[in-house]
């Protein structure tokens, strides 16, 4: 493309190349819209077709996964690994198992991951992978056979200095263990090619908690910069999985009253707030094969909003921790009308572009996922460092490093987030992540 093209011309170019990839196009639009004024002031970043290269993955691997279920029936799923950018290190990003997974979603996640990893200051590139396999309702044997079948193809594309996956939606410690075990068997190599592993074979303390903890660390820093804090605040959390659980735990430690959590079936509301005992029971219920938030609500006699998200509940802080585009304009209007002060993304792109703009116009503090939920991948980077050194750090050391990284990310967002009274964290995160990746790409030439 001509180096003088406009923002809309560039976005139309991306849309035209992949007309059916709506999630990816949305992610590119969100990033480029905030970057464009910076790019016009810094024309060197429009040279050498850098932007065109930045929105095109270095490699996309697609393959079938054939496995046998408990009824002895052959099942066929589709899987991908999007190796988006290795400009600053090996590809790094999770594997997602969910029926909704497609190439558009994985490209959007890999694109976001590239900037998120750059923000951590650790030497990690961006990638993402997954399958349309649904682990819900499957036996442990079926999940194991699927993971092992998937690795018979994926293993040849991974390596400690090439591509290091981790978990994501539908992929927890169990699934990572199955995949890492099969990788070791096929490659005859025990090098670190997965993070989020069990502690018995190279995992890191604090890794399961890291995304949720990091979200709260970042949000607390954002609140403090604007004269507030979690202490005494009413908080709602969407989701009830790994990220949500540990965000609830850390928010309680900071003095917040967490009054809502959810899953795909509905929302539980507890005006008295979660306690350690209640949270432990929720985690226990959700870890069972078919455990639902409704079961938790019934057991404790709490309000249950069937089929609803938590955004109608009046709160000071909202933490969307479920999935992409869960918080739309209508939900944003509800939150704003109820006096929400801050929204911080625990999931990847859970807020639509229109809702994000609405929050910013209303003066609501808004922390984008690429900054606020970077704690998980940051601790994955720390796990890689421990594996490379053949060491295991104490929980306190990992947690302290995580906290320090999240404060550094917050500082980078503030540095690039404008000079007004209220920091534009979307702009700050996008520019800070972009500059690191773009500088590396320019230094390495046209490759």
Which sequence ranges carry the predicted segments?
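N-terminal ligand-binding/catalytic initiation module
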Residues: 1-205, 436-445
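Adenosine-phosphate binding glycine-rich loop
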Residues: 2-27, 222, 336-447
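Predominant activation on well-ordered alpha-helical scaffold segments within soluble catalytic domains
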Residues: 11-12, 29, 33, 103, ...
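Active-site nucleophile and cofactor-binding loops and adjacent substrate-binding regions
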Residues: 72, 168-169, 207-211, 236-240, ...
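General beta-strand structural signal in soluble alpha/beta enzymes
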Residues: 162-166, 190-194, 237, 260-263, ...
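Conserved helix-loop functional segments at active or binding sites
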Residues: 185, 220-228, 324, 333, ...
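Glycine-rich phosphate/diphosphate-binding loop of Rossmann-like nucleotide-binding domains
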Residues: 195-198, 203-314
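Rossmann-like adenosine-cofactor binding region
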Residues: 266-366, 371
């Amino acid at each position: 493309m001509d180096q003088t093209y406009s923002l809309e011309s560039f976005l139309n170019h991306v849309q035209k190349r992949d007309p059916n990839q709506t999630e990816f196009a949305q992610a590119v639009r969100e990033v480029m819209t905030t970057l464009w004024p910076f790019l016009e002031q810094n024309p060197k970043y429009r040279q050498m077709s850098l932007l065109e290269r930045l929105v095109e993955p270095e490699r996309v691997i697609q393959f079938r996964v054939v496995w046998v279920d408990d009824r002895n029936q052959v099942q066929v799923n589709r899987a991908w690994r999007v190796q988006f950018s290795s400009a600053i290190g090996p590809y790094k990003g999770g594997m997602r198992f969910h029926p909704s997974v497609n190439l558009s979603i994985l490209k959007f996640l890999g694109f976001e991951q590239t900037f998120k990893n750059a923000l951590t200051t650790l030497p990690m590139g961006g990638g993402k992978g997954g399958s349309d396999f649904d682990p819900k309702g499957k036996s442990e044997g079926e999940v194991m056979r699927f993971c092992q079948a998937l690795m018979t193809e994926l293993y040849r594309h991974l390596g400690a200095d090439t591509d290091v996956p981790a978990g994501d939606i539908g992929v927890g410690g169990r699934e990572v263990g199955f995949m890492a075990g099969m990788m070791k068997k096929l490659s005859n190599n025990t090098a670190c090619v997965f993070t989020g592993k069990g502690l018995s074979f190279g995992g890191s303390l604090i890794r399961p908690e890291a995304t949720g903890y990091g979200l709260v660390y970042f949000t607390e820093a954002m609140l403090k910069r604007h004269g507030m804090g979690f202490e005494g605040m009413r908080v709602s959390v969407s989701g009830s999985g790994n990220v949500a659980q540990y965000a609830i735990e850390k928010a309680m430690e900071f003095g917040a009253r967490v009054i809502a959590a959810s899953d795909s079936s509905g929302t539980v509301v507890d005006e008295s707030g979660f306690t350690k005992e209640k949270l432990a029971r929720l985690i226990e219920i959700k870890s069972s094969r078919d455990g639902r938030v409704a079961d938790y609500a019934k057991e404790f006699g709490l309000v249950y909003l069937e089929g609803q998200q938590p955004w109608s509940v009046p709160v000071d802080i909202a933490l969307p921790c479920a999935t992409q585009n869960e918080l739309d304009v209508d939900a944003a209007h509800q939150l704003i009308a109820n006096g929400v002060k801050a929204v911080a993304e625990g999931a990847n792109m859970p807020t639509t572009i229109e809702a994000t703009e609405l929050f910013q116009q209303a003066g609501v503090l808004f922390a984008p996922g690429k900054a606020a939920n970077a704690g998980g991948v940051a601790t994955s980077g720390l796990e890689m460092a421990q594996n490379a050194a053949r060491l295991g750090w104490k929980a306190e050391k990992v947690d302290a490093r995580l906290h320090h990284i999240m404060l550094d990310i917050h500082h980078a967002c503030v540095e690039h987030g404008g000079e007004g009274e209220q920091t534009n964290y979307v702009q700050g995160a996008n520019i800070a992540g972009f500059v690191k990746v773009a500088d590396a790409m320019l230094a390495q030439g046209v490759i």
